[in-house]
Swiss-Prot record:
Residues flagged as site, Cleavage: R231, N232, R241, N242, R247, A248
Motif KID motif: chain residues: 644-646
InterPro entries recorded: ConA-like_dom_sf, Rota_A_VP4, Rota_VP4_MID, Rota_VP4_MID_sf, VP4_concanavalin-like, VP4_helical
A Gene Ontology biological process term: permeabilization of host organelle membrane involved in viral entry into host cell
Region: Spike head, residue numbers: 65-224
Protein name per the record: Outer capsid protein VP4
Taxonomy of the source species: Viruses, Riboviria, Orthornavirae, Duplornaviricota, Resentoviricetes
């Protein structure tokens, strides 16, 4: 393995002088470390909601009950109910097309015998005969005349206890409610000059879309919601509806707070989500009558749309969770039709849509709070799929439908073939809808849900409209760059060379091929092969090796090995215990005791995160001492170092010791290690994150810190080349077998090479991220 170079150096330089050890310990305690997460940091955790933020309203999500509005004269929109809410008896509404229809509605209180009342209709005093025999319900009387000078006649009536009445323009006619509450009917007026028909309301009213007609009927039967009957609800002018037409403010960047270096910006965006399902239909071998699997697969979709005049390029990834497995067996004969397993999503399932676009909001999606979204529902219906049998009538799976309801939004990361993108994951819950699905010419019928056989129903995509809002922490100056200055020391010339060499090394990370890196990491590199690409290195090999050893023995890695060697002889003397909580260090082991570091943080070692972080900082030494057949981080580190040395144009013999020593300390700073016990995996990283899960399902289990400490002492420690998040993402998007999972957990280089040769974007992205961490 490539990490042999570090083993050779440690074998000859683990002993250090006391003065060097004191200097290194003091340096380690005073060193400030800043981790740059990079432009594509993993942000898989739900953001903390620090405050309510601001979410502007827009017309993309239409309200059910819009109002109340003040009495006015206007031309009501088509296909919208005008829900009238009068308080007193009298004229409620007038309407006319100014040609051949004059319509009016008056309200009569309960317990009124037949009488003649005078109403002012269209500016004229009219004598109208009215009555209301009901003791509890108010009576709406709809009147009509065909000439301006004619007399009004009764057209229809409505008895309503809540005193609510509805009028709507639809289909070239004017529609009203008539009859009695709980048994309502719809009555239409035939009218000409339909578009110019205007209404004059003499009471407060609401606007309800025709798509919510059932809700409007419910209000007329039982009354408005309680919140509408309080004094806190004040009617406004109908002209306020026109404000929504100016929707530029919905897509806006608002500076919430600002300091000299940082600012909080709230991004409000309208959003159009387009997605599609993907599936896999696998036919069994044999005579052609049997299918082994019909399943959902993740689907990527890229598209463009216009947002406030701006052309937006968006990318979505659709996946499902909680699928239901169905099967059909037509018999045991080889020519009997059979589907071993086909997936169906139902009420217990979820659909995830990861969304990213090229707008400013997604360029700063690293530190995020107050994330909120509001989306419309979408109906997904299944299409037909014909099972082509060699002989006989062909069965057809047809139908099925589900409604997607927005159920939440979190941050996520999308992986493409070239880059990983910080994105929003919209989660949708499901409800089953008509029609049901069935398989013709079989007994499978009247089942509900959406099967995976043809989930898009020959559509290019499904579309959802809505909006989202988030607050992101970004630099105050968009053009700000941190200045880089060379340190002025007695080694000024060498430091300048090292600075230029570091910059060159860091830029070379983009040129390293992942597939070649894996092969190089498996080679047993030694000092000679490491520097074989440098001119005149053969002649100076002996002196160069001595210089590297001398420099390397002062490194933190060599210092830690020396401390470990001393602590192995008397591990129990350096164990610190806590009286209230059993510390990790209660395992009498030099691997779980971090020497004097643990004493310095004895007051904070109570948390699991601190304990696992304390252990994981020592696991590299444990791994070096107990080499396994799997690949480790030092193999990748040494392979990257070798590749960069070969590619470098500025490398020289005098700066090789500094480069190798610095690479051993700084390459891949964020590492995770794992131990395996039967079917359970315990994984901890140097930044304090920890996971415990099952191998087969990647289902989380409680993290037993004491068991983890014991396993670290007795079991091999494995570099988590493919960490838990990457494994879970790989399983969710592609699906992996139990054997593949075990091999990836053991960092088997053969399996890693197979995934890379298959151009798997998730595995390639993980290895590329490790390469990018190999910085000086």
């Amino acid at each position: 393995m490539a990490s042999l170079i570090y083993r050779q150096l440690l074998a000859n330089s683990y002993t250090v002088d006391l003065s060097d050890e004191i200097e290194n310990i003091g340096y380690a305690k005073s060193k400030n470390v800043t981790i740059n997460p990079g432009p594509f940091a993993q942000t898989g955790y739900t953001p903390v909601n620090w405050g309510p933020g601001e979410v502007n309203d827009s017309t993309t999500v239409e309200p059910i009950l819009d109002g109340p509005y003040q009495p006015t004269n206007f031309n009501p929109p088509v296909n919208y109910w005008m829900l009238l809410s009068p308080l007193n008896a009298g004229v409620v509404v007038e309407g006319t097309n100014s040609i051949d229809r004059w319509l009016a509605t008056v309200l009569v209180e309960p317990n009124v015998l037949t009488t003649v009342r005078t109403y002012t209709l269209f500016g004229v005093q009219e004598q109208i005969s009215v009555e209301n025999n009901s003791t509890t319900k108010w009576k709406f009387i709809n009147l009509i005349k065909t000439t301006l000078s004619g007399n009004f006649t009764l057209y229809s009536t409505l008895l309503s206890e809540p005193k609510l009445h509805g009028i709507m323009k639809h289909g070239g006619q004017l529609w009203v409610y008539n009859g009695e509450t709980q048994t309502l009917l719809l009555q239409d007026y035939v009218t000409s000059n339909y578009d110019s028909l205007t209404m004059t309301s003499f009471c407060d009213f609401y606007i309800i879309p025709r798509s919510q007609e059932s809700t409007c009927t419910e209000y007329i039967n039982n009354g408005l919601p309680p919140i509408q009957n309080t004094r806190n609800v004040v009617s406004v002018s109908i002209s306020s509806r026109n404000i929504i037409l100016n929707r530029a403010q919905v897509n806006k960047d608002i500076v919430i707070s600002k300091t000299s270096l940082w600012k909080e910006v709230q991004y409000n965006r309208d959003i159009t989500i387009r997605f599609r399902f993907a599936n896999a239909i696998i036919k069994s071998g044999g005579l052609g009558y049997k299918w082994s699997e019909i399943s959902f697969k993740p689907a990527n979709y890229q598209y463009s749309y216009t947002r406030d005049g701006e052309e937006i390029t968006a990318h979505t990834t659709c996946s499902v969770n909680g699928v239901n497995d169905f099967s059909f067996n037509g018999g045991s004969n080889p020519t009997d039709f059979l589907i071993s397993r086909y997936e169906v999503i139902k009420e217990n399932s979820y659909v995830y849509v990861d969304y990213w676009d090229d707008s400013q909001a997604f360029r700063n999606m690293v530190y995020v709070r107050s994330l909120a979204a509001n989306l419309n529902d979408v109906l997904c219906t299944g299409g037909d799929y014909t099972f082509a049998l060699p002989v006989g009538q062909w069965p057809v799976m047809t139908g099925g439908a589900v409604m997607l309801h927005a159920a939440g939004v979190t941050l996520s990361t999308q992986f493409t073939d070239f880059v990983s993108l910080n994105s929003l994951r919209f989660r949708f819950s499901l409800s089953v809808e008509e029609p049901y699905f069935s398989i013709t010419r079989t007994r499978v019928t009247r089942l509900y849900g959406l099967p995976a056989v043809n989930p898009n129903n020959n559509r290019d995509y499904y579309e959802i409209a809505g909006r989202f809002s988030l607050i992101s922490l970004v630099p105050s100056n968009d053009d700000y760059q941190t200045p880089i200055m060379n340190s002025v020391t007695v080694r000024q010339d060498l430091e300048r060379q090292l600075g230029e060499l570091r910059e060159e090394f860091n830029t070379l990370s983009q040129e390293i091929a992942v597939s070649q890196l894996i092969d190089l990491a498996l080679l047993p590199l030694d000092m000679f092969s490491m520097v074989s690409g440098i001119k005149s290195s053969i002649d100076a090999a002996k002196s160069m090796a001595s210089n590297v050893m001398k420099k390397f023995k002062k490194s933190k890695l060599a210092s830690s090995i020396s401390t470990l060697t001393n602590s192995l002889s008397d591990a129990s003397s350096s164990v610190s215990r806590n009286s209230s909580i059993r510390s990790v260090s209660s395992s009498v082991s030099a691997w779980t005791d971090v020497s004097n570091q643990l004493t310095d943080i004895s007051n904070s070692v109570n948390s699991i995160s601190t304990q696992t972080s304390t252990i994981s900082r020592r696991l590299r030494l444990k791994e070096i001492a107990t080499q396994t057949e799997g690949m480790n981080f030092d193999d990748i580190s040494a392979a990257v170092l070798k590749t960069k040395i070969d590619k470098s144009t500025q490398i020289a013999a005098n700066n090789i010791p500094d480069i190798i020593t610095e690479a051993s300390e700084k390459f891949i700073p964020n590492r995770a290690y794992r131990v395996i016990s039967n079917d359970n995996v315990f994984e901890a990283s140097t930044d304090g994150r920890f996971f415990a899960y099952k191998v087969g399902t990647f289902e989380g289990i409680p993290f037993d810190v004491q068991k983890f400490a014991d396993l670290v002492t007795d079991s091999p420690v494995i570099s988590a080349i493919i960490d838990f998040k990457t494994l879970k993402n790989l399983n969710d998007n592609y699906g992996i077998t139990r054997e593949q999972a075990f091999n990836l957990l053991r960092s088997d280089p053969r399996v890693l090479r197979e995934f890379i040769n298959q151009d798997n974007p998730i595995i390639k992205n993980r290895i590329e991220q490790l390469i990018l961490q190999c910085r000086l």
